Amino acid sequence: MASEPAATVADLDFDNEQYDSAEDEDFQLDPDQEDADLTGSDSDDEATEPAAKRRKTGPTKAATEDQELDSGDEAMIQKVKARKEGKQKGKKSQGTASDEDEDDVDFDDDDEGGPGGFVRTRAMRMRMQEERKPLAKIDGATVDVDAIWAQMNAPDSSAGILPSQTQAKDATPAKDENKNADTAEEQVLSPDSKPQYKEEMVKIKRTYKFAGEVITEEKIVPKDSAEAKLFLAKGESVETVTDADVEHAANAKDALKLRRPLRKISRFDPNPTGTIKKSWEKQPTAGITGQTENISGPKINTVEKSRLDWAAYVDQAGIKDELKEHSKAKEGFLGRMDFLNRVVAKREEERRNARLKGL
């Protein structure tokens, strides 16, 4: 029984042993508490240790978190407040502040838009303070605006004419009006007026070979035209036509203009009837069938073809009379060349005489 109390006392002594935190790996000291312990010293320690040897404490955990959450707006707000206080002090000391020292951005109490530090520029404030001009009113108008608007919208063309213009028109003499009316009637009737006699129309039909092709032309032209004269100069006979034939030819020409080419069959279209396959087959040429042998005509060169085209252009442009007048004039190309040759010969003769006199 005596051994049991001894063991109990040993156990009690083991429990009362002092705990060493340096040997415990799981023990971690709170940094805030550690800083507090370092900074918070007794009065005796402060008296004995000099101030230069005091340990400087770093930023606390709360200050670090605030710095991480700082987006720059807080610094902007503080800068604005500091500048505003500086301006107020400057105004008190100097009396008035010069405009040259002011920045482009003015900071007022109303310009701060809250925690974001939004500021309004000078142009933005002026735009906000600018008053819109009121719309025009017709309260003091002496003219009936509605009547004028209705008159302007009226389909009558004389609505936009001023009264002064109408008075000037009424003041013109009646003789001028009669003259203008007569000239206007003449201008209107002149295009539609028919000549006293009808031109004799002839039918030209020619067949010729040019550039390997057989061309057949059939035209109805006036007998006095350039094409008719060129055709008659070759000794060909023409056929005189009547007015009915001319109208029929004109109607046929108009009908041809309205015709449109048929749609060409494509190889990519569906082919239920086999029409596309037939279109692929090579068609027999005119030479194989002997059609060229039946058609006879003279072979013309480029000069003769140009002469035919020029005659057609003269009739189409209506410059036959103008060409006839210039062809009879003395100031033609050959006459000018003769004049220039005479001038050159005279100069050479004068030079030769000058050289002979010098000798």
Curated annotation (Swiss-Prot):
Component of the SWR1 complex which mediates the ATP-dependent exchange of histone H2A for the H2A variant HZT1 leading to transcriptional regulation of selected genes by chromatin remodeling. Involved in chromosome stability. Residues 286-295 have a biased composition (Polar residues). Keywords: Activator, Chromatin regulator, Nucleus, Transcription, Transcription regulation. Belongs to the SWC5 family. PANTHER family: CRANIOFACIAL DEVELOPMENT PROTEIN 1, SWR1-COMPLEX PROTEIN 5. It comes from the Eukaryota. Residues 1-124, 155-197, 265-300 are annotated as: Disordered. Residues 12-48, 98-113 have a biased composition (Acidic residues). It comes from Aspergillus fumigatus (strain ATCC MYA-4609 / CBS 101355 / FGSC A1100 / Af293). This is SWR1-complex protein 5. GO terms for biological process: chromatin organization. Residues 282-359 form the BCNT-C domain. Residues 172-182 have a biased composition (Basic and acidic residues). The gene is swc5. Pfam families: BCNT.
